């Protein structure tokens, strides 16, 4: 009989690391409680359709990384790859989506990725969801929480990158110009990038292909299509919080999930090597229209 060992990318965690994780969770929970957030726990298993409809059919999570299987009733279930979709599903299912909610959670997530330094197939993740609040005030509060994390954990050599993806009209105008620009480069795209071009061209903006990246750097920028109100939000974030953490405006930042609209952000550290991102998020109004007909700013 072959020796039984742990699944690749799913490490055992012993005392030194469990103590560190306990301290980290205690610090994060203290920060979240100081912002009057309430803890929520959702199941590790969800219907696969939830993640297809929320993260997007073109997302890497759905196409490459999700752990799915059929149960005895031939229902497709998945280990959660992220926490947001389950929280939103819970709020809608319990008919709580007509009120405002400030929630936080933490727990194990699962993604079928190539294990490497800083990236595992089972990993712990903490998250914050501000549900039902209008754009602007909640965006500033979420950045305030991020800054508190930077300060409390004394994060060094770290930068907070921000961008704004605009609203539906902004995206449509920008995508129209982007597609015109990309026509001259279409023949140079890889098969994978051609698929992104056909299904979700915004995904090309965070391409790691050097030649494509250089080409896109000279093309249209979404920031040029933003309203004065949207630009003012980015300016306010930089002016209010820039004194506490280093903030960069990154027009290529789109994040990896289809449900983001409006503000997006990502924290990176030069201490982490190639996998330098350790925190990220953004506004996701469209996620509420995926599992539910209700429209709720989130």
Question: How would you name each of these model-derived features?
Answer:
Residues 17-37, 46-47, 64, 74, ...:
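Positively charged, Gly/Ser-enriched RNA/tRNA-binding surfaces
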Residues 1-17:
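Auxiliary tRNA-acceptor-end handling modules of aminoacyl-tRNA synthetases
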Residues 297-298:
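N-terminal low-complexity segments that are often proline-rich with Ser/Thr-Pro
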Residues 163-176:
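Short, conserved secondary-structure transition motifs
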Residues 54-58, 175-176, 263-266:
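Short low-complexity, flexible loop/linker segments enriched in glycine and/or proline
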Residues 4, 51-55, 260-262:
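Short secondary-structure transition/capping segments
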Residues 40, 44-77:
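Polyanion/phosphate-binding surface patch
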Residues 64-71, 177-196:
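Acidic, His- and aromatic-enriched active-site or binding-groove loops in soluble protein domains
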